A protein has these predicted regions:
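Surface beta-loop-beta hairpin patches that serve as ligand-binding interfaces in beta-rich domains
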Residues: 414-463, 468
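Glycine- and acidic/polar-rich repeat regions and solenoidal domains
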Residues: 55, 83-88, 102-119, 126-420
Length: 495
């Protein structure tokens, strides 16, 4: 039976890729022998079972039209176990599809060093905590540290399930090369993933996603983080930490996350159309109550627009919107200090019954003395039963302006500042709120089993994946290939 399946796979693959080969692999030794010698168009199918891959280093390269594919025969049926790391050094156009990583303590599941056009898709990731002080970065995208330039870029991490990270270290890191002049990975995409559980809380270095690092913060990364679900990601005050320029974080759902999406370093970033749901969650950390926050901003020329925030429980560092003071002026310095918020536009957002909607000028016990500059709070809708706006220090129009905002106050709600009719319109009834039900990310539209509309093109590893001949997509739990207008399963069975 196994031979027949192998023959069927071989015939199908040859019809799609010409001279490319396909191999069905059954043991870790077969995998470690076959993958380093991969050629463009090769497909490696891992049969159901356990694979101890240990420390596997790959430098093979596919092409745009003939990527190298490493995939499970059945979705999540091939399990990678024990300790190890897949290092992709100067590799290109490789796709890892449908694997189950259930490993003991290790430094990383994947480490991309100068790799480009790598796709990590529809996998599940879990790691045990085996020792005190354990740290890991589950997926690290960048280059060899001392290189002068960064060759990494155009990688995609999508439709994965990341479960219960319980050790130290950030989960996904977009990094780069740290030589002279150095550089950051560019045009990477993190989308349609589920991040479920990241705890316990620590003071620093446990972000769920981090884009950049202080010494590369003036580099433009152009990373897009979109359509992800973050649930109970409490490990770091910054759930998503942006530490570079020209990135976009959009259409994500944050549920019960004790922290914020933080534009921590860099300029010209965008946080758009995200959903933040606090659901009443709080906790105690270092004898202080912490809550679920929204977006905290440092640096200049950022846009925060179209976000929906409901029931958020954070304040001070973690209100719905935090524009704290800074301890440094904006410059091209790569200092790890907190640049003051400057020319930040907060517009078109909806805030519903958050403990604290907007806080401006928090000084961190007088450590941050530089006030926000030329920020705007415009066209926002607020429903509040507490004080909506908190000014920690006196502000003028040179610091922040307000215009065309609407607010409905219930219970003990107040605006929290003196205002004019052009700044806030006080509503007499509950306004119509944006419909968010179809925008919330769930297991049905994210993660390994998340659906994709097969008739809608999806920007992917090779540009646009469609149902054209030879293209592969996911449908009803199966890997599907289209040939001659007819759909086939991976093993060549007509659907």
């Amino acid at each position: 039976m196994r031979a027949k399946r192998t023959i069927g796979l071989l015939m199908l693959t040859l019809s799609l890729y010409g001279n490319a080969s396909i191999q069905v692999l059954h043991t870790a030794s077969e995998v470690k022998s076959a993958l380093p010698a991969a050629q463009p168009g090769d497909t490696f199918v891992l049969a159901d079972g356990n694979y101890e891959l240990s420390w596997l280093k790959l430098s093979c390269q596919g092409t745009d039209e003939q990527p190298i594919v490493v995939q499970a025969q059945n979705l999540l049926g091939a399990k990678v176990i024990k300790s190890g790391c897949i290092t992709l050094e100067n590799a290109a156009y490789i796709e890892f599809y449908g694997l189950d990583f259930d490993m003991s303590a290790t430094s990383s599941f994947f480490k991309l060093q100068g790799a480009h056009h790598i796709r990590i898709t529809r996998n599940r990731f879990r790691m045990s905590v085996d020792k005190e002080g354990q740290t890991s970065k589950w997926i690290l995208v960048g280059d060899i540290w001392e290189h002068d330039t960064c060759a990494s870029g155009y990688n995609r991490i999508d439709h994965n399930l990341f479960l219960h990270k319980s050790d130290g270290g950030a989960l996904i890191v977009i990094d780069g090369a740290h030589g002279s002049p150095g550089g950051i990975s560019v045009h990477d995409r993190i989308d349609h993933n589920i991040f479920r559980g990241n705890s316990p809380r620590v003071a620093n270095e446990k972000e769920t996603v981090r884009i950049g690092v202080s010494d590369l913060s003036m580099d433009s990364s152009y990373t897009v983080v979109e359509y992800n679900l973050f649930e109970d990601c409490d490990g770091d005050p910054e759930v998503v930490s942006v530490k570079s320029c020209c990135n976009t974080v959009r259409n994500n759902t944050f549920r019960r996350c004790l922290g914020t999406l933080c534009l921590r370093h860099g300029f010209n970033n965008r946080a758009e159309d995200n959903i933040f749901l606090g659901e009443g969650k709080t906790a105690v950390y270092e004898e202080e109550v912490i809550g679920c926050g929204g977006i905290r901003v440092y640096g200049k020329d950022h846009t925060v627009s179209g976000n929906y925030m409901e029931g958020l429980t954070g304040y001070k560092w973690d209100p719905a919107i935090a524009l704290t003071n800074g301890d440094a002026s904006n410059s091209v310095s790569t200092s790890s200090k907190h640049f003051l918020p400057e020319n930040v536009l907060v517009s078109g957002n909806t805030f519903v019954r958050c403990i604290s909607t907007l806080e401006v000028g928090f000084t961190n016990n007088e450590k941050y003395s530089k006030k926000p500059k030329s920020c705007r709070f415009e066209d926002n809708l607020i429903v509040a039963d507490t004080q909506a706006v908190t000014m920690h220090t006196a502000m003028t129009s040179s610091n922040i302006t307000f215009s065309n905002n609407r607010i409905w106050l219930t219970g003990n709600g107040t605006v929290g500042m003196s205002y004019t009719a052009s700044q806030f319109t006080l509503l007499s009834a509950c306004p119509a709120l944006p419909a968010i039900e179809d925008r919330i990310m769930t297991d049905q539209n994210a993660g390994p089993y998340g659906s994709e509309d097969e008739d809608q093109p999806t920007e992917g590893l090779r540009g646009t994946d469609t149902t054209a001949n030879g293209k592969k997509y996911f449908h009803n739990g199966q890997i599907v290939i289209v040939r001659g207008g007819v759909r086939y399963s991976l093993l060549g069975t007509r659907l």
